[in-house]
Regions:
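N-terminal leader/linker segments that initiate helical-solenoid repeat arrays
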Residues: 9-52, 285-298, 302-305
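Alpha-helical segment of the N-proximal tetratricopeptide repeat
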Residues: 16-35, 56, 60-63, 116-128, ...
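Structural marker of alpha-solenoid helical repeat scaffolds
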Residues: 43-46, 80, 109, 143, ...
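Helix-start (N-cap) detector for alpha-helical repeat units in TPR-like alpha-solenoids
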Residues: 51, 85-86, 114-115, 148-149, ...
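Structural signature of tandem alpha-helical TPR/SEL1-like repeats
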Residues: 63-72, 95-105, 127-139, 162-177, ...
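Terminal, low-structured helical/coil segments at or just beyond the last alpha-helical repeat
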Residues: 105, 258, 262-305
Length: 305
């Protein structure tokens, strides 16, 4: 067995090498230090030293646009240090730069692709430029009318721009087009139901809500919609069953708990209704956390309850 003094000496030397490598990597000498960083990253040992080596190695590989190799390191870092701010920062940088590089190559190599129009539409959508987004989605559909998700995204952009009668009908038609391509799209079914409800066509809407629940039995919003229909028909026990499923699917969904509370009351289950009221109060109460505790230490009031 190696004497303890020798082990400590090796550790100190290893740490010195690491500090030197980190300094060189930070100065931009990635080509000169990456092989040694990779060896340190692959060597079992002190976890924090491996973390530092991994962070530097990932950043060097990102800078060199070696995204598959960087992704491997980032993935292991996230697994071993899931709450580490430095790891999460490097992960964000990796995904952003990999995305930007892929987008650049797509615009360069396939400028006429419908995917370019789709991506442009998505960018406009995030900027709140819905007129431009709608135009780009329509270009994409003109090039590939059978592209999955294009009609859905166009419908969503139409609704984001306006809820007037014309926009609602156009959106309904686009959701319907999506369903013709992908009949298993529960969200599109639900959206059609929502529009038909707004258009005062409850019977047609109900069929779409029912279908959405069939497609996705844990779809909380669709379960709530069907439960409201059951409650409207005074079929309260059936509404309760549906809403209990919605609450199970989304335990912190206030709308699910509220509708379940009302259904319990209508079904004569006062104690269960009170339990749901307590749960709603819990959801609405701001969580106690670091910021609240910080305010308390300063003598300031916590957020209003």
């Amino acid at each position: 067995m190696m004497p303890v003094t020798n082990v400590l000496l090796l550790f100190v030397l290893w740490q010195g090498d690491l500090n030197s490598l980190l300094t060189r990597a930070a100065a931009g000498d990635c080509s000169g230090v990456s092989p040694q960083l990779a060896r340190m990253w692959a060597t079992p040992g002190d976890s924090q030293s491996r973390r530092l080596a991994g962070l530097a190695l990932a950043q060097c590989r990102i800078a060199a646009k070696q995204f598959p190799e960087a992704g491997s390191v980032v993935g292991e870092l996230e697994r071993d240090f899931p709450a580490d701010a430095d790891v999460l920062y490097v992960s964000a940088a990796y995904h952003l730069k990999a995305w930007n590089d892929a987008v650049y190559r797509m615009y360069k190599n396939a400028p006429a692709s419908y995917r370019v129009d789709q991506l442009s539409a998505e960018v406009f959508e995030t900027q709140g430029k819905y007129t431009e987004a709608i135009a780009e989605y329509r270009k994409a559909i003109a090039k590939n009318s059978k592209g999955i998700d294009l009609h859905y995204r166009l419908a969503r952009a139409l609704l984001a721009q306006s809820h007037d009668a014309s926009a609602l009908e156009q959106a309904r038609q686009e959701f319907a087009a999506e369903l013709r391509l992908n009949p298993a799209d529960a969200v599109a079914e639900y959206q059609v139901g929502q529009i038909l409800t707004t258009q005062l066509k409850p019977a047609e809407a109900a069929a779409h809500f029912e279908r959405a629940v069939q497609l996705r039995p844990d779809f909380a919003e669709a379960l709530i919609a069907v439960a409201k229909i059951r409650s409207g028909a005074k079929r309260y026990p059936e509404a309760v069953v549906l809403l209990e499923r919605a609450v199970k699917a989304q335990p912190n969904a206030e709308a699910a708990h509220y509708n379940l509370m009302v259904a319990y009351r209508n079904a004569g289950r006062a104690e269960d209704a009170q339990r749901e009221k307590t749960e709603i109060d819990r959801i609405q109460k701001p969580p106690e956390g670091e910021f609240t505790n910080f305010l308390k230490r300063l003598g300031g009031p916590p957020p209003p309850k």
